[in-house]
Amino acid sequence: MRTVLINGRVLTGDGLRDDVAVVLDGDRIADVVDTASALDAERVDLGGGTLLPGFIDTQVNGGGGVLFNDEPTVEGVAAIAAAHRRFGTTGFLPTLISDDLDVIDRAMRAVEAAIEQGVPGVLGIHIEGPYLSARRRGIHSLDRLRDLDEEGLALLTSLKRGRTLVTVAPEAAPPAMISRLAAAGVVVAIGHTNAGYDEARRALDAGATGVTHLFNAMSQLGNREPGVVGAALDDPNCWCGLIVDGRHVHDATLKIALRARPWTASCWSPTPCPRWA
């Protein structure tokens, strides 16, 4: 049975439009048509609301009263998914900050099980640490940080279902390790790092493809040393995460970054998600 969604602001390839209707065929979008030519079908009035595709969030530390580090279980993943689904997030990576290897292992197995059991929206896992710089650790516990070794490499490449995104500092994960992660299908991002421009470039050349929360917990753009920020903005193939909560990054800084790397350059914008989200 076909249904037509009318009287809404619909995001299309041409921006937000209020002169189109969305045609549904069962649970699938069949067409987007001019409102005037909408089919004779059951109509749902959106009341002037905005209709958007579901959001995909690559950095979700928790939600629904659950912090993933505290509850690396299928139940924890499901609670986080349900909490964020209410706000339009239909796909996400449960994100673990620096922790012991056994906790990382439990989290990865929980994500595998969640995908197997059909928990909606789970796309894989984001492992943010423990292979980070002590100088730029932020809230990550110093006693959890370590250099990437063979044991860690084996763990990070062990996910059987979904995608693995890891955030590493080049100081703790040298180019050879980054290359091996990338070769195994792991998406590697640079973050929580005090690396200079040249070291960051070597990491990108080795297989890192992005930067986690650009500007935060990393070396900054300077006149003689461009830092990680400069390396990220200078590389057209590097995606950039941004925390756009009005606190982590100044509005002017955000605008400058978006001018330097427009949306066509695949700039991601995850936001932090505390346990009470």
Which residues does each predicted region cover?
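Divalent metal-binding pocket/active-site signature
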Residues: 127, 134-150, 155-227
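Active-site metal-binding loops of divalent metal-dependent hydrolases
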Residues: 60, 170-171, 193, 245, ...
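Histidine-rich, glycine-flanked metal-binding segment
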Residues: 1-6, 10-52
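Charged helix-capping and loop-helix junction motifs
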Residues: 74-75, 107-110, 149-151, 224-229
